[in-house]
Amino acid sequence: MGDAGKGKKIFIQKCAQCHTVEKTGKHKTGPNLWGLFGRKTGQAPGFSYTDANKSKGIVWGEETLLEYLENPKKYIPGTKMIFAGIKKKNERLDLIAYLKKSTSE
């Protein structure tokens, strides 16, 4: 598993413009990520998802996020997430470690 401290820096640099992680965080361009792990795609309450996200039907976990974050548009064709992805596996692992910690405490 990755380093949550490094993952926080990656989140701030690459994700925080569109996402929040706090329990009471608001949706931005992207959904609030609180409760992400164990939730199906397209299910954050109050966020308007594309049909592609709603119908993907996978459950977010370490493995699914590892694949998704490498190339979101390849993993969920039709997603409105405008993000090229993170090619370095160790950076994705760090980000996932941070998300796992910050979206459930």
From Swiss-Prot:
Heme c binds at C15, C18, H19, M81. GO terms for molecular function: electron transfer activity; heme binding; metal ion binding. GO terms for cellular component: mitochondrial intermembrane space. The modification N-acetylglycine is found at G2. Keywords: Acetylation, Electron transport, Heme, Iron, Metal-binding, Mitochondrion, Respiratory chain, Transport. Binds 1 heme c group covalently per subunit. One of its GO terms (biological process) is mitochondrial electron transport, ubiquinol to cytochrome c. It comes from the Eukaryota. It is found in: Mitochondrion intermembrane space. SUPFAM superfamilies: Cytochrome c. Pfam families: Cytochrom_C. Belongs to the cytochrome c family. Electron carrier protein. The oxidized form of the cytochrome c heme group can accept an electron from the heme group of the cytochrome c1 subunit of cytochrome reductase. Cytochrome c then transfers this electron to the cytochrome oxidase complex, the final protein carrier in the mitochondrial electron-transport chain. PANTHER family: CYTOCHROME C. This is Cytochrome c, somatic B. It comes from Xenopus laevis. The gene is cycs-b.
